[in-house]
Amino acid sequence: MRNGPRVQPNGERAIVQIVVRDNNVEQALRALKKKMQREGTFREMKRRNHYEKPSEKKARQKAEAIRRARKLARKRAQREGLIAKRGGTTRR
């Protein structure tokens, strides 16, 4: 399953909805922030803040692809036992 923004059939993004229970606005705000973070809304807002030249966009996408490939290779190596999993040791 993809963690990208949800897109409706007409191509527009879905509206994020949060239910406020028992007038607990703080909890609703935390849930909204978490949902927006998960869907990449903050990253998208930051990216759209300024114009991005096509060459910059291409470089960013290439860097993201390299990052994804490295992460996938690292996870695969951890599964096969070639490298230790991160966070397993404690520092003193």
UniProtKB/Swiss-Prot annotation:
The name this protein goes by in its record: Small ribosomal subunit protein bS21
Keywords: Ribonucleoprotein, Ribosomal protein
Originating organism: Maricaulis maris (strain MCS10)
UniProt feature, compositional bias: Basic and acidic residues: 51-67
Region annotation (Disordered) ranges: 37-92
InterPro entries, A to Z: Ribosomal_bS21 (IPR001911), Ribosomal_bS21_CS (IPR018278), Ribosomal_bS21_sf (IPR038380)
Cellular component terms per the entry's GO annotation: ribonucleoprotein complex; ribosome
HAMAP family: Ribosomal_bS21
